[in-house]
Each structure stands twice: as structure tokens, then as C-alpha cells.
A protein has these predicted regions:
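Acidic/polar, glycine-enriched structural segments that form the non-catalytic walls/loops
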Residues: 1-187, 206, 217-224
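Conserved hydrophobic/aromatic pocket- or pore-lining residues that grip, position, or stack substrates
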Residues: 160-163, 196-197, 263
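Residues at structural and domain junctions
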Residues: 116, 146, 182-183, 195-198, ...
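Elongated scaffold/linker segments in the mid-to-C-terminal portions of large proteins
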Residues: 51, 71-75, 79-81, 253-257, ...
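Helix-terminus loop motifs that line ligand-binding clefts
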Residues: 164, 168-191, 204-265, 271, ...
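Generic hydrophobic, aliphatic-rich segments that mediate packing or membrane embedding
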Residues: 12, 156, 192-193, 212
Length: 293
């Protein structure tokens, strides 16, 4: 079984059960790569360009500090029913004590964010989050349709909601393929934000949209400065960015403006669901400055 926390923590959990674990015929390897711009986002050949440092360790738990160039984060590993051993510069191997092994891996920019929960706690949180998502959101039933394609269409609708929620509803506008893979070198393209997230308020999932709407408010001043540099008033949103909201190097992307109206449209859809004066007050400046440009 595999699950993610689904209630605000970056934790993955795995639960394994096999006689092969008990007999030591199999073990679990956890390896950390260097970053890359290709589709996997991983470079396994540059061992000397990143660091994996053990800060705390015991048989079942280990806290790591990871450094890649100027980026750093913490990783906590909890192997319930097992032993963790470091084998190489960036490689851990986990052996089971018996036929059952539960592993959880927590990641965070701060040390306390890497404090691991048990795999069962993570799976319980995942179930609660999943229940909230499906009970709150909209659904379409096609079971009474006579069209032979109805069942497959319904399956795809359900699957699409799940995939878009887990891959594209984080705290920043998603990159072009969300978290599925590392397309366009991991950059976010704001004209794609609409295609990833506009469905959320239409399907009663506006709370998931709120996560990334906050990014626009936090970077409004940068958008104003971007417009001013070009001789305009208001806020000009860049096309291709990293999380900082600054135009990525390109001979064409900084000239494009097709991403500009998306945020106004999505705020309007979110407001139609909320009908909340506080929401208007919180986002009015964002709408006005974007429209002024």
C-alpha cells in the first residue's frame, strides 16, 4: 500500500508485507539524485554536486539534511519494523525485521517539517483527505445512458479529477504537466494555469484553488514592477517563471501576454461559488491591477 499525507504534510508512506522481507531476499533502497532539467528531474551521475548528511539516526529512524547547490531541505525516514543503514554518499538501504515493514518519508524546508509520522497515521490522513475531496466535490453519473461509451467516459471523469487534484492543486501555479513529470524544465507557464485549475470551483473544489490564488497576491508587487519596466501601469504577469515570479530567460516568453486575463476569470469563478465579501476585499486589488495593465 502507498499513500501521501493529504492533510498539509509532505509525507509518503509505504506498507509492505512478504515472506521475502523476513527471509532477507529483498530490501528497500532509497536513493537521492542531483537535480536535472530532463523529464525525470533526476541526474544520477553527479554524486559530488550534492550532499546528504545524517543529523540523527537510530535503527528505525533517520533525519537527513540535503543540499543541492543553493537549495536545501530535510528528509526524515521512519522504518517501523526495520533497520536503516547508509550505504553510499546518497543511498540508504532498509532491511525488515520480519515479514512486515512500514516506511514513511517526510520532507520539508524546516527540520520540524521532516518529523515523521507512522505509515498508518499517514494512511489514515490520506483516507480522511480523500473522503473530504469526494464528498465535497461534484460528480457526474452516466449509468442511465444508453451510449456504450458512457461507462468509459465516467471512469475518465473520475480519474481526471483525481489526477488533477494530486498533480496540479498545490501552493503555486503548476508547471505544464503538474507533478506528473518534469516538462519544460520544471518551469511554470501561467497561461496553462487555467487548464489545470479552472475546473476546481466548477466542481465545488474552490478550497483547492485558494492554495495557488495566494501566490498571485504574494507576487503582485513583482507584477507591478514588471509592468512599470515596460512602461505600463497595473500588474503584468510573466509567462514562464519559477516560484519567484520573475521571467525566465527566453527570447519570446517575456513578450507574451496571453496569460494576463486568466487570474481575473478564475477569481470570478471562485467568487461565484463563495459569494463572500471578504474574498472580494482580499482580491480586489489583484483584479484591478491586472485589469489596468
Amino acid at each position: 500500500r502507498t499513500a501521501c499525507h493529504n492533510e498539509g504534510r509532505d509525507i509518503l508512506a509505504f506498507s509492505l508485507e512478504s515472506e521475502a522481507l523476513k527471509e532477507k531476499k529483498i530490501s528497500i533502497v532509497l536513493d537521492f539524485p542531483y537535480g536535472a532539467s530532463d523529464i525525470t528531474a533526476s541526474d544520477w551521475t553527479q554524486n559530488d554536486r550534492h550532499r546528504t548528511t545524517i543529523l540523527q539516526t537510530s535503527d528505525e529512524k533517520m533525519l537527513l539534511w540535503r543540499q543541492l547547490d543553493r537549495d536545501e531541505y530535510y528528509a526524515g525516514i521512519y522504518a517501523q519494523g526495520g533497520k536503516i543503514r547508509k550505504e553510499g554518499s546518497h543511498t540508504l538501504r532498509i532491511f525488515a525485521n520480519g515479514e512486515k515493514l512500514d516506511i514513511s518519508i517526510a520532507l520539508g524546508k524546516q527540520k520540524e517539517q521532516a518529523e515523521c509520522l507512522s505509515a498508518q497515521e499517514v494512511m489514515n490522513a490520506s483516507k480522511r483527505g480523500g473522503r473530504r475531496f469526494w464528498e465535497r466535490g461534484g460528480i457526474i453519473q452516466l449509468n442511465k445512458s444508453a451510449d456504450p461509451r458512457a461507462r468509459e467516459l465516467e471512469r475518465r471523469i473520475i480519474l481526471s479529477q483525481y489526477l488533477m487534484a494530486i498533480n496540479s492543486s498545490g501552493s503555486t501555479p503548476p508547471q505544464e504537466t503538474g507533478l506528473t513529470c518534469n516538462s519544460w524544465y520544471g518551469k511554470m507557464h501561467l497561461e496553462m494555469y487555467l487548464w489545470h485549475c479552472a475546473w476546481l470551483p466548477l466542481w465545488h473544489q474552490e478550497e483547492l484553488l485558494d492554495r495557488s490564488l495566494a501566490w498571485y497576491r504574494e507576487h503582485l508587487q513583482q507584477a507591478r514592477e514588471n509592468a512599470a519596466r515596460n512602461g505600463y501601469k497595473g500588474a503584468r504577469w510573466p509567462k514562464m517563471i519559477a516560484t519567484e515570479g520573475v521571467d525566465c530567460p527566453s527570447n519570446i516568453a517575456p513578450l507574451l501576454v496571453w496569460q494576463q486575463p486568466h487570474i481575473i476569470y478564475m477569481l470570478e469563478m471562485a467568487y461565484r461559488r463563495k459569494r463572500n465579501r471578504r474574498f472580494l476585499e482580499e482580491n480586489w486589488e489583484l483584479v484591478k491591477e491586472t485589469a489596468d495593465f
